[in-house]
Amino acid sequence: MHDAESTVDSLLKEIDNEMEQTKSNITQNGSEDTPHNWKLPLQEIGDDTMEMLVKHNTRSNATENSRGRSPSKMSTISNESLNLGLLRVNSELEESPAAVHQERIKNSVANGALGHANSPKVLNNLKNMAQDIDKLARDEEKPVKLSSSPLKFTLKSTQPLLSYPESPIHRSSIEIETNYDDEDEEEEDAYTCLTQSPQILHSPSRIPITNAVSINKLNLDFTLNPNESDKSLVSDTSVDSTGRELDTKTIPELPFCMSSTPEMTPVDEKCNLPSKLLNTSNNSHSDSRSPTASVEDLNISTNLPGADSSQNNPVTTDADALIENDVVRDLQQNMEHIDDAFDEKKVLDEGCSNEPVTFLGENDTRSIVYSNKGTNANVQEFSQEDSLAHSEPNFKDLNATSDDVWNEDKETDANISTSTKSEESYIADYKVTRQEDWDTKKLHQESEHANEQPAIIPQKDSSEETFTELNNESEFQRNSKDGEEYRIVQHEESLYGQRTKSSEENIINGSEIGVDHGEADEVNEPLAKTSAEEHDLSSSCEDQSVSEARNKDSIEEKEVETKDENIETEKDESEYHKVEENEESEHVPLLPPLPRWEEIQFNEPFIDENDTSNDSIDLTRSMKPSDYISIWHIQEEEIKSNSPESIANSQFSQQSSITTASTVDSKKDNGSTSFKFKPRIVSRSRIYNPKSRVSSLNYYDNEDYILSNSEWNALDPMRRNTLISKRIQDNIRTQKGHAPLIRPSVMKLNGEDSGFQNHFLEVEQPQEHENIPLSTHLSEQDITTNVGLDEQKLPTNTQDEAEISIREIESAGDITFNRGDLLSLSFDEELGQDFANFLDALDHDSTSFNHGPDDSSSFQRDSSKKSFNSLWESSYELKPPPSIRKQPIAPDVLQKLLESDTKDDADLEKIREERITEPRTGLGIGMLKTPVKDVSIALAASIKGYEASFSDTDSRPEGMNNSDAITLNMFDDFEEDKMTPSTPVRSISPIKRHVSSPFKVVKAGNKQENNEINIKAEEEIEPMTQQETDGLKQDIPPLLAQTKDNVEAKEETITQLEEPQDVEQEFPDMGTLYLSIKAISTLALYGTKSHRATYAIVFDNGENVVQTPWESLPYDGNIRINKEFELPIDFKGKAETSSASSERDSYKKCVITLKCKYEKPRHELVEIVDKVPVGKSFFGKTKYKFEKKYVQKKPKQDEWDYLFAQDGSFARCEIEINEEFLKNVAFNTSHMHYNMINKWSRIADKIHGSKRLYELPRKAPHKVASLDVEACFLERTSAFEQFPKQFSLVNKIVSKYKLQQNIYKEGYLLQDGGDLKGKIENRFFKLHGSQLSGYHEISRKAKIDINLLKVTKVLRNEDIQADNGGQRNFTDWVLFNECFQLVFDDGERITFNAECSNEEKSDWYNKLQEVVELNVFHQPWVKKYCEKLAEEEKTRTTGHNLKQDFN
């Protein structure tokens, strides 16, 4: 004890000696290190300074009220027993630390008995002290040094725990100017002492007198019982205190951020301290800007007498020792975290390290808590918005001055305390249980004393207030960041470890974390387990405002936790429901039951073992026993032999429900039927027919027509031993003998008799080299002879026999050869009905056949009579129509191909009528032909047991007759078998027309040559020429096969026909002439003003007359008209023998007439000379003067009466439009001047009124005005040209055309389409105007020229997808993902893509789009007009250059 007292005495002396040095050091470093330390001279001390001193000594942190500097302000420096007048009295009493601490407790703001502050004695003493300070400042006298014995403090020395950072931010230094001789030395010692580390400060020779002393003393109350603490706080017993006079001239304001020493550990938001600690901890604050300042900071020596008062509370020293030991132990355990809290670098980087959480009222018992931004390095920094959103509602405005806020501050007993996560063990050691009744009682007592005297708040500058607000707001943000980090960590741990536990267990274990930022932060788990009451209080403290009481907060916290529990439960339930909904959404909603499909097996779809309608087979192997068709028919024959009635297809059975079942009916009842449909994918399988296959014609073998014996062909209508078979054979023989070119063709299957042999007429086209005449016919032996592929050719016979006409052949038997309906004679009608039902099923099939454009037959669905033949009469085209079918052949031409030479017109007309009236029952076949050679498309092999016939081959070599192939139509196209490779310009079609191509392929090496090949995506038929029409009218039909020479000759003919012929195209007119009447000048008409004349222009072109509105005639005689007229130039007449180059007989005349209207003047001004007498002498003459006057007189005659015609015409100009005139103004604007003639004026009569006006003679025509005209003629060069209605639009159109021609771009593009078929190529393109030219990528040889005038639109990538229905293959997606496409007027498309940036692609697209949009301005007259303008510009430039050279 004695050592400590001597140490304090020596320290005070050193402070006095080094004071001056300290002042100088602070002056040099104050602006850099301590920006908040400033000095206030004593001369400026007034009421504000005194109020600031009061604030320092009372440790109050109340908010500023609105009363300002009121004379009624009371200071609460200490209790009423404190005599400030004793400050000058030296005290020699020694006090124990316990007594000092007890005295501070009584004088602190925590003391609830503050009623003595109302004493006027305290205020008087304060004023006296201020006056003494002012007097010392004025006199500049050196104060007498106190001779009293030095102060003796009982301080317990502790070892330093941490390295004290030597930072000005952590110093709480006050520089005081004194008049002592050793002032410099004392200030220097004080400054050195304050800036030293705790190790030096705690040495025996130097102990700092800082706020650390009061903080250590505050720890003494941790072990006080509630009753004892209550007595010491509420006790009214006063202890006499003595002080000493202020040792300074100036009292600087304390820095905002106080130092944090090991004894004053910063406490964070999450720490829940006991109420006793909170109630007593505010002893350390005395100012809103430096809440932890104490008396020692002001250098006011408080020599408190009455050392024996230290015996009043002997427990204090022991408790202090116990508490400090606990503190030392706990801080050593948390050394790492505390080092982070006092890290100087973090503090300096982040600004003010310690800032108060809030400012409290005078009697508020809450502790001012500091939060270090760098306390925990692992704490996640939250955003300012989150921190403010969390903390801002919990605090009042720092500058609030309303009484309501003041009262709320006094009534508040909430304990706001925070703690960092690293200090949980430090807080947990203070296991002091609090009692709610004691706290309530203490709150009541303190509130009573607080209501008696309000705090005196000094007025501060606006800058200080703003700075305080900002610092506190930043402190709130840091505190909220720590709280947010703690809550997130706890929330993650609780969700991970206890997701399946109930909400009640989560609340007990402290793992239930609030989600909302507005909810209170949860307490640490150790404190939550220790006391539920502390958990409620600490949770409520985070969210309550300064005006809320603890009890209310406790209740609200419970409600918040309950609500939080409900929210968490609802969130879990909602997440669970969302998961269920997502799972349910993945399932397809229940639909009506679908039909149950059977497995793919070899069961029959039509409940018929012999039906193979969905099979496609190779007919070359149909006779082998291993084929299904042979096996099935063999089985059919066996079944029929046993029981014919049991077979549905038997000729003995009637139609049953089983046989009438069709695919259409099954499709209608697809959802509920029990029909076992075989889900086999039926496609158009192609059957290869090699030419080397030998075809046998067994039905022509011998005289008796022994047909091939087939065990399964029991239903053959031509089978042996039947009358029908022999009748058919006889008809065949007769037809073969009399009409070799028009004979029935027998349907067969690989040389064997088919299920139904149908005959119909087919024209055989003879080979060109055979030259078979129409009159020849084949003999019977020739007909029945086997014909091999390459063995023998069709012989000819020149026997002169009477030719039989088609009508005679048809009437020879019961068979109608022109329709070939032999099946109706041998089969029942029910088969046709079943087959019709099968055709209805094809109608619903997605793979239905294409309809031919020339298909004139329609599907006869007459329920009364349907036959099997309706298949071939239906609208179903069973093969893709080639290009030669696009133009039907006229019926008369077809008839000529079929008739003989001997038929007359009457017979032909009769046959034609009968053909029209006959029912169309002709039969085709089930064979499809494609343009591919030797390939046919196979359909059903059999339907209900009846075989469809197929041809052996699609290609007939030389020597084969036409019986080997049955074509689809009765009269098929002329050339079907030998498909000569065709090109767009060289086609074998008999009907051709020339269509220009949007682009041309340029031969390499010579782009200028016109040897382009027109490329077309789809072949188009050219119009029939006269030569080809004449050829069709000949008796000899077109040839089916041509030799190579003939083909070449035909191609040459077609090439010649393709060349354009010079045929004059009839134009509707010659063109359009635009006349613009600019003005009429030098008008010889006087007296316009007096006559009030008006004028109008009459424009007459011989067909129409146009008159302008009447306007006032200008007085100067110059009329500005600016009227424009459009004049179509027609052909007036032609000679009959005139050609396109002949001259026109006559042209139009344009007559322009000027008409006037005027008013006759009623009076005429006449000049007269009056003789006025001037004066008269007495004997002299009278003198006169002459004066001129104008008087109005009635005019005798008006000159204008003789100038105009009766209709008002005054001047006329006739413009003759002849060839020379049109040539001069063609595609050029020319300025012309014409004289306007007056031929209506008459010679005035000398004697007015002697003759009538029409009796007067006329004057000779004479010029009365000049007409200025601009003319331009646009000559028509095409019948489709369109001319604008006004000449003003011509210039606009020309400007648009020039804009199009000036568009230029070049670069590399990927091309797909056009001349590139099936491949993509990178080329170099040049865009110039409406021409897009493509060149080779490397050699730059011309490859393609694209005429953009035929492009209708340019599509982007998204437009291409929409136009194509959104279907794109993978190659297009990769190479042409961001492409553009040119669409031509004929449907041709060319796709381009640029391997460059998006800007380059957009540039290509924009330029092409602009060119296409400007195509509407691209007409022949526009082009010629631009060329004419270019020539004029060139001529004008040349003339100007020559003129300059000449000069």
Curated annotation (Swiss-Prot):
**Which keywords does UniProt give here?**
Cell cycle, Cell division, Phosphoprotein
> Where does it localize?
Bud neck
Q: Can you quote a single GO CC term?
A: cellular bud neck contractile ring
List, alphabetically, the SUPFAM superfamilies matched. PH domain-like
**Residues with Phosphoserine modification:** 10, 78, 81, 91, 96, 167, 367, 511, 616, 805, 811
Q: Where is this region: Interaction with IQG1?
A: 768-879
Provide the positions where the record notes the PTM Phosphothreonine: 365
The record's annotation in SMART domains points to: PH
Expression is induced as follows: Cell cycle-dependent with low levels at START and a peak in mitosis (at protein level).
Ranges of Polar residues composition bias in the record: 22-32, 59-76, 277-316, 497-509, 538-548, 649-664
UniProt's post-translational modification comment states: Phosphorylated by CDC28.
Positions of the PH domain: 1302-1413
Q: Which domain of life is it from?
A: Eukaryota
Task: Provide the residue span(s) of the region labelled Disordered.
Answer: 1-37, 57-76, 272-316, 444-588, 649-672
Asked whether the UniProt record includes Phosphoprotein among its keywords, one would answer yes
- Family membership noted in the UniProt record: Belongs to the BUD4 family.
Q: Tell me the function of this protein.
A: Required for establishment of the axial budding pattern in haploid cells. Cooperates with other bud site selection proteins to recognize a spatial landmark during mitosis and they subsequently become a landmark for downstream polarity establishment factors that coordinate axial budding and cytokinesis. Involved in the septin organization at the bud neck.
Q: How does it assemble?
A: Interacts with AXL1, IQG1 and SEC3.
Q: Which PANTHER family match?
A: BUD SITE SELECTION PROTEIN 4
What's this protein's name? Answer: Bud site selection protein 4
> Which gene produces this protein?
BUD4
